[in-house]
């Protein structure tokens, strides 16, 4: 399975840059393209000062374009996008496939004093559901937000899905590089699946400090090995993943087998 991460700062959909990267990915045989958080939309702090009608207009335009690009280039595009329903603003991750579009509504949102998405967005607080799972050419993906990677309960929902790759768009900042790398490699190893993480770049300046989004998009193997990563610049990362390697990792470590023996 050939996939790609497009590591960018916040982009308007009129950006020729975005179209050019899509064409390059298509020529390289990419089947799935992953974007980081707050690339199609302004950063969360900027969204807070925008009207719902403006966000809705922006989202409608973006969705139309992404559907067309997915169909034109026969490529699945996974992209976090802010949408509006009945004047309420929701944080979602969209999967634009050539023949269909699906949305995963983020279930656990960050809720700290300096960064409270849970308070701003209308995403319902309810019992956790299984994240979006789908296949491309027999290769099974699941997708969650970067913040949701912290929670064991999310992985409990995925434990019997036998996914090959977990897609994780993120918006990491504040020099958290080492912590995120440790978290991603550990999750990939203990669940014996690839993790492809797309993090945005750029910065946001508020009254108190500068939020630097440092990139470092990465691919980690089912054995917890860091296979490839980007720096802090605008880049396209093309990766190859193999279902056979996922199966081999599961058989080698036997984590799920050890638990299944003990399930009543």
Regions found by a protein language model. Give the residues of each.
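Short, acidic/polar
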Residues: 14-24, 150-158
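Cys-nucleophile CN-hydrolase/nitrilase-fold catalytic domain and related Cys-dependent amidase chemistry
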Residues: 19-98, 102-106, 173-187
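CN hydrolase (nitrilase-like) catalytic-core segments centered on the catalytic cysteine
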Residues: 55-78, 150-236
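Short beta-strand scaffold segments in enzyme catalytic cores
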Residues: 79-81, 91-95, 132-134, 197, ...
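A conserved C-terminal secondary-structure "cap"
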Residues: 246-264
